[in-house]
């Protein structure tokens, strides 16, 4: 049995992530999906909590044809111990999928087999671009699976994102 690991911040989970995970699922028997920077939320670049992101993925991946686990992974201060940190919080895995140079380097140094993730149209499917559209009031729902858009609406995520992204330069005490 082949079990793979894939990590992302998923702020928010979008069709680019979905395409990558769907392709990985064609090559493995099980998939461990790490919600990276799990401790971060309520920030302009990380507006959603780990629990909200778990829910987004759980709902969006309901029909994924392989067994999968969605687990929060907090950051650690030292890159040299990060792989051990990840491994201690996940089921054992045989291969890591990533295009992130640091993730690739750290897992290879730790002796893991690393494969590059299948590519997607990053210019179109980007968490940064989706968050920008949300703040600007532009259409964004077509860039994420329907259950993700529903989750964001249910938690009033756009209001939160706008509030945490707003400057307080016009306010004085």
From Swiss-Prot:
Homology family: Belongs to the archaeal NMN adenylyltransferase family.
GO BP term, example: NAD biosynthetic process
Alphabetical list of HAMAP family matching this protein: NMN_adenylyltr
UniProt cross-references to Gene3D superfamilies, sorted A to Z: HUPs
Pathway(s) this gene product operates in, as recorded in its UniProt entry: Cofactor biosynthesis; NAD(+) biosynthesis; NAD(+) from nicotinamide D-ribonucleotide: step 1/1
Main location: cytoplasm
GO cellular component: cytoplasm
UniProt entry keywords in alphabetical sequence: ATP-binding, Cytoplasm, NAD, Nucleotide-binding, Nucleotidyltransferase, Pyridine nucleotide biosynthesis, Transferase
Cited CDD domains: NMNAT_Archaea
EC number: 2.7.7.1
Protein name, as recorded: Nicotinamide-nucleotide adenylyltransferase
EC supergroup of this enzyme: transferase
Transmembrane regions: none
Localisation: Cytoplasm
Taxonomic source organism: Methanosarcina acetivorans (strain ATCC 35395 / DSM 2834 / JCM 12185 / C2A)
Reactions this protein catalyses: beta-nicotinamide D-ribonucleotide + ATP + H(+) = diphosphate + NAD(+)
A GO MF term: nicotinamide-nucleotide adenylyltransferase activity
């Amino acid at each position: 049995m082949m079990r793979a690991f894939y990590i992302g911040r998923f702020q928010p989970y979008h069709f680019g992530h979905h395409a990558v995970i769907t392709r990985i699922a064609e090559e493995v028997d099980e998939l461990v999906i790490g919600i990276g920077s799990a401790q971060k939320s309520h920030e302009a670049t990380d507006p959603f909590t780990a629990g909200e992101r778990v829910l987004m993925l759980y709902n969006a991946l309901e029909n994924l044809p392989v067994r999968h686990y969605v687990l929060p992974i907090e950051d650690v201060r030292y890159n040299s111990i990060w792989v051990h940190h990840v491994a201690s919080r996940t089921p054992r895995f045989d291969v890591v999928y990533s295009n992130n140079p640091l993730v690739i380097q750290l897992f290879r140094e730790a002796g893991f087999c690393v494969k590059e993730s299948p590519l997607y149209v990053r210019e179109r499917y980007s968490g940064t671009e989706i968050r920008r559209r949300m703040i600007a009031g532009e259409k964004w729902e077509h860039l994420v699976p329907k259950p993700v858009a529903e989750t964001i609406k249910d938690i009033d995520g756009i209001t939160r994102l706008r509030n945490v992204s707003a400057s307080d330069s016009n306010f004085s005490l």
